[in-house]
A protein has these predicted regions:
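Short glycine- and Lys/Arg-enriched binding-loop motifs that mark or flank ligand-binding interfaces
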Residues: 7-10, 83-84, 170, 336, ...
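Short, solvent-exposed loop/turn segments at secondary-structure junctions
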Residues: 13, 47, 90-94, 135-136, ...
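Core alpha/beta nucleotide-donor-binding catalytic domains of modification enzymes
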Residues: 1-125, 134-149, 157
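Extracellular structured ligand-interaction cores
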Residues: 5, 179-181, 330-332
């Protein structure tokens, strides 16, 4: 089977950077792709901004095969056939209800991007998919933990897919950032790969032979499996109303039945902030001085603030102190879209030349996500470069999954 890919919610191309082992670009700004995954289509659209910086970056690096329109308005007929669908999508409300119009059946809320993913999977009969989301997806919503993921899994099962997932902290496997994300791999029950799955069995897949166990080895310990039968529910509306179960950080769904267990990674030495720190001189614009430095000292310090609830009662909001700056001997913390702004979560490091405290540079932010240097230096403001990296994934995770995905698809 050909290795053809579409990338949804593409951002600045993280899945493509990882799958095609991209480390830089040529004099024209075009990415130098070192593997042969053929990206036949991509979509990137930011509804909140007039200037489409992420799309512009994607086109600069890869060319014009990227769509820049609301994915919900894209007709599936206009999307090329493909073997692998990939994309990182936000954690939203996945609850469903019966529509007032019986012809429409069960409907999810408008604007929830997962339903666009499932529409495309259904219409294009995509053999394989790889998705990324925040780790809290497994426990959402807070008042009915696990419900949203249960709805997603049952929906995918009804579409003819089996699914494997794992929460991966990139730093546990040698990356430069402590970033926990859930990765979800799915395959059609009609694929040759599914025939092999039947012989192996779900527990062995989670422990040793699955996509994630092969790429990201785990300790072979005797943790208990939890079994969840999603077919006991009439449909996803029933799951929305009555779901009660907990998902662990690893699991697999086969024919609507789930096996899930907590797994422990076999830890690898991570890349440290000290290793990704820029060596070049004259980074004065990033050095903290005066009021800005005082503001960070306050934000990172411990505090106890008297606040008032809506009902008028008072309480103290407490916040523990952080170290003055981020250790150069550790990987970075989870980078947010607010990186580089005056914010408690922003990284602060000592400058190599002067020893003074400073912000990360956009290049260092790119290195935390395993992107090539200056990947986002395509004309967007620096503030947006940080934003793009805060929204991106650690491409090293995808790069590491690539050999396993390649073997599966080439053997189809």
């Amino acid at each position: 089977m050909k290795k053809t890919v579409i990338e949804l919610f593409a951002g600045v191309g993280g899945f493509r950077v990882g799958l095609n082992d991209i480390h830089g670009f040529d004099n024209n700004g075009k990415a130098i792709e070192n593997r042969d995954w053929k990206f036949v289509w991509a979509n990137q659209w930011e509804p909140a901004t007039t200037v489409q910086h992420a799309y512009d970056c994607y086109v600069t690096r890869f060319g014009n095969e990227c769509s820049n329109e609301d994915i919900s308005k894209v007709d599936s007929k206009d999307i090329p056939n493909h073997t692998l669908l990939c994309g990182g999508f936000p954690c939203q409300d996945y609850s469903v209800a019966r529509s007032l119009s019986k012809e429409k059946g069960i409907e999810g809320k408008k604007g929830v991007l997962f339903w666009d993913i499932t529409r495309i999977l259904k219409d294009k009969k995509t053999p394989f998919f790889l998705l990324e989301n925040v780790d809290r997806l497994l426990k959402s919503p807070s008042k009915q933990r696990g419900r949203d993921f249960g709805i997603m899994l049952r929906t995918l099962s009804d579409l003819g897919y089996n699914v494997e997932w794992r929460i991966i902290n990139a730093a546990d496997y040698g990356a430069a950032q402590r970033r926990r994300r859930i990765f979800i791999f799915g395959w059609k029950k009609t694929t040759k790969y599914n025939e092999n799955i039947d012989y192996i069995g779900p527990k062995y897949l989670i422990a040793q032979e699955g996509v994630f166990a092969r790429a990201f080895p785990i300790e072979q310990e005797d943790s208990k499996y939890r079994c969840i039968d999603l077919l006991q529910y009439e449909d996803t509306v029933d799951i929305t109303k009555h779901f009660k179960a907990e998902f662990e950080n690893s699991g697999i769904m086969i024919n609507g039945k789930v096996w899930t267990r907590k797994v422990t990674p076999i830890y690898e030495e991570p890349i440290t902030i000290g290793e990704i720190r820029e060596n070049r001189k004259s980074l004065d614009k990033y050095i903290l001085t005066g009021e800005k430095l005082k503001k960070f000292e306050y934000l990172r310090g411990g505090k106890k603030i008297l606040r008032t609830r809506p009902d008028g009662t008072e309480y103290y909001y407490s916040e523990g102190s952080m170290s003055e700056y981020d250790s150069l001997d550790l990987p970075g913390r989870t980078m947010l879209t607010s990186e580089g702004s005056v914010n408690r979560s922003t990284h602060i490091i000592p400058d190599k030349e002067t020893g003074k405290l400073r912000l990360l540079t956009p290049i260092e932010a790119e290195r935390l996500q395993s992107f090539p240097d200056d990947w986002t230096n395509t004309g967007m403001p620096e503030k947006r470069r940080y934003f793009m990296m805060g929204n991106a994934l650690v491409t090293k995770v995808i790069n590491r999954l690539e050999p396993v995905l390649r073997e599966i698809i080439e053997n189809q």
